[in-house]
């Protein structure tokens, strides 16, 4: 009964290190790890111990006998990653474990290491976790929104609740006694980089890539145009996108680009609102989908089927739950690519695409929109005068023009980082120049003292949620090495002074207790309607919920004050 990794794999590799026989690959030290779409369990080497199940933060692993029908393709996907061996042959258990990168060891100094982390998404939380392994390290996480966890909260599709379970791990990290949240505090507005450095040894920026790459064709910007990432944020109740004008009163939506985000949007637009009602989808989005007139979602790509940007797990998830079709011309392109492509992963995608119909057969899901995957279409302009009415494409590599009428046109062509005040920025690469996480002055090539980056702002928008774990670990290793070598300046202000500064600049800052109050209130609201949670989508509502949080215990406040004063802390234990 070997175990199987399924669609929601986040690539954080906790399962790799939990496995006693090293049967999960690629491991973080292997070349393919950074670009792998998921991790894979070797069914021949697996000893069925289940250690990986409890280690996985997103519940992506199960015995092969407990898979849902839609998950069955992952049995072969896991197995096909490994060489073919005779059926029934079981490998002997091995004592060779995946190599573990040791945690960065912080040397004791007069002042314990104190780090500010800007951002609260996966890269930020994994960095905090790595730092808190060491005794005495204090981590303060700053987030401009009243709620943490970045794209896990606002960028993962509502119907991917397993993926969102990684927030349980993040909540455990945030519960550490040397961890503090400063939510609803924007760096660059309420506090500056220099002020953070005055209160910390180092500042680690894990702010992601918050902007979209824009498609510069005529008509983009008309009402009825937007980006897929904006729509996902709207679906998830991000307060900055509450009022996003999403017009679903027309029969067709066109999405330009065919990565995973494009598939997420197509899948949700075609989903049954009754099924979505059990998720954490925002109320305004659920209402709009219930009244949607959309009958078709077209996902258009410039290149051919062999160059599809979506991952194999996402394609499997899409075709398992929606009516997905290809035009006859695109079906022939799939067959042509199958005849020449050798890469196993690409062939797996093409084989699934080759099974899709052309839409002439009766719909599998009566009354639901169908999804059409279209290839070799290069967008030329958005049609319409006062609002979008469709898209004009050319067939890639030719002068042939094609037109698709649509009432909503979305682009999904990638994310882009944006400049951070007081730090250098590479406009072309859209990231902060760095060497292994150390921010580098591009003029001199020298490190910027006390400044570090992790996640997408460090490496660009690549990888998956768990990819940020190894990325953040590398940055923390560099930061700790600099601290140990005396290259980081001790903070000149006390923790209490930081609290006072934050309170003066942003009286509505929210701490860990406030976040727990918001979280509990959302879960309670959802529970009343049989939902995972019912999110607050307005900042004022979040702030009101946060005020119900209990005050920090007097004992903890006294201990914090004694630490500020440098007084010894003596605990009396009754005999």
UniProtKB/Swiss-Prot annotation:
Annotated spans, Ferredoxin--NADP reductase: 115-575
Domain 4Fe-4S ferredoxin-type: 2-29, 37-66
Record: residues binding FAD: 123, 143, 151, 187, 456, 463-465
EC top class, as a word: oxidoreductase
UniProt: [4Fe-4S] cluster 1 binding residues: 9, 15, 19
Pfam families named among the record's database cross-references: Fer4 (PF00037), Pyr_redox_2 (PF07992)
Coiled-coil region: none
Gene Ontology CC annotations of this record: plasma membrane
UniProt cross-references to SUPFAM superfamilies, sorted A to Z: 4Fe-4S ferredoxins, Nucleotide-binding domain
Catalytic activity: 2 reduced [2Fe-2S]-[ferredoxin] + NADP(+) + H(+) = 2 oxidized [2Fe-2S]-[ferredoxin] + NADPH
Family, similarity comment: In the C-terminal section; belongs to the ferredoxin--NADP reductase family.
One term of GO molecular function: metal ion binding
Record key words, sorted: 4Fe-4S, Electron transport, FAD, Flavoprotein, Iron, Iron-sulfur, Metal-binding, NADP, Oxidoreductase, Repeat, Transport
Species per Swiss-Prot/TrEMBL record: Mycobacterium tuberculosis (strain ATCC 25618 / H37Rv)
Protein name listed in UniProt: Probable ferredoxin/ferredoxin--NADP reductase
Cofactor note: Binds 1 or 2 [4Fe-4S] clusters.
Residues binding [4Fe-4S] cluster 2: 46, 49, 52, 56
PANTHER family: GLUTAMATE SYNTHASE 1 [NADH], CHLOROPLASTIC-LIKE
EC number of the protein: 1.18.1.2
4Fe-4S keyword on record: yes
Residues noted as binding NADP(+) in the record, renumbered to the chain: 213, 258-261, 302-303, 314, 463
């Amino acid at each position: 009964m070997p175990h199987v990794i399924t669609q929601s794999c986040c690539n954080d590799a906790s399962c790799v290190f939990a496995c006693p026989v090293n049967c999960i690959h690629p491991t973080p030290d292997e070349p393919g790890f950074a670009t792998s779409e998921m991790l894979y369990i070797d069914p021949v080497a697996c000893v069925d111990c289940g250690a990986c199940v409890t280690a996985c933060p997103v519940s992506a692993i199960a015995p092969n006998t407990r898979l849902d029908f839609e998950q069955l393709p992952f049995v072969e996907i896991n197995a096909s990653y490994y060489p073919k061996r005779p059926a029934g042959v079981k490998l002997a258990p091995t004592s060779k474990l995946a190599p573990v990168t040791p945690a960065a060891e912080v040397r004791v100094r007069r002042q314990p290491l104190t780090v500010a982390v800007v951002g609260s998404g996966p890269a930020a939380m994994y960095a905090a976790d790595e730092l808190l392994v060491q005794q005495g390290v204090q981590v303060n996480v700053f987030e401009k929104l009243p709620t943490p966890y970045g794209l896990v909260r606002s960028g993962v599709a509502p119907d991917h609740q397993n993926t969102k379970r990684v927030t349980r791990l993040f909540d455990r990290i945030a519960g550490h006694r040397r961890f503090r949240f400063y939510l609803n505090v924007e760096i660059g507005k309420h506090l500056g980089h220099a002020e953070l450095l005055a209160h910390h040894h180092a500042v680690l920026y894990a702010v992601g890539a918050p902007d979209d790459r824009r498609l510069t064709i005529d008509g983009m910007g008309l009402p009825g145009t937007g980006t897929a990432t904006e729509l996902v944020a709207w679906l998830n109740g991000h307060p900055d996108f509450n009022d996003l004008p999403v017009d679903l009163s027309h029969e067709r939506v066109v999405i330009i680009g065919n990565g995973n985000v494009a598939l997420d949007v197509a899948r949700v637009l075609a989903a049954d609102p009754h099924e979505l009602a059990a998720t954490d989808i925002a109320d305004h989005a659920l209402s709009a989908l219930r009244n949607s007139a959309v009958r078709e979602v077209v996902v258009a790509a410039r290149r051919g089927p062999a160059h599809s940007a979506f991952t194999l797990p996402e394609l499997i998830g899409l075709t398992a739950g929606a009516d997905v079709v290809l035009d006859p011309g695109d079906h022939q392109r799939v067959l042509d690519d199958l005849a020449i492509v050798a890469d196993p992963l690409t062939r797996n995608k093409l084989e699934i695409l080759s099974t899709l119909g052309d839409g002439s057969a009766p719909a599998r899901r009566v009354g639901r929109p169908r999804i059409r995957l279209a290839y070799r279409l290069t967008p030329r302009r958005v049609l319409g005068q006062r609002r979008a009415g469709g898209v004009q494409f050319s067939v890639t590599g030719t002068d042939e023009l094609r037109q698709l009428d649509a009432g909503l046109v979305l682009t999904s062509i990638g994310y882009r980082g944006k400049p951070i005040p007081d730090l250098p920025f590479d406009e072309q690469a859209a990231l902060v120049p760095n060497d292994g996480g150390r921010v580098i002055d591009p003029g001199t090539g020298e490190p910027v003292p006390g400044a570090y980056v992790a996640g997408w702002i460090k490496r660009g928008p690549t990888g998956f949620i768990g990819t940020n774990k190894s990325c953040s670990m590398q940055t923390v290793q560099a930061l700790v090495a600099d601290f140990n070598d005396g290259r980081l300046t001790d903070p000149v202000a006390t923790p209490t002074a930081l609290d006072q500064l934050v309170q003066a600049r942003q009286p509505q800052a929210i701490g860990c207790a406030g976040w727990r109050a918001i979280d509990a209130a959302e879960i309670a609201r959802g529970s009343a309607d049989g939902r995972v949670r019912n999110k607050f989508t307005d900042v004022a509502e979040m702030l009101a919920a946060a005020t119900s949080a209990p005050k920090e215990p007097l004992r903890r406040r006294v201990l914090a004050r004694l630490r500020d004063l440098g007084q010894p802390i003596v605990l009396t234990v009754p005999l």
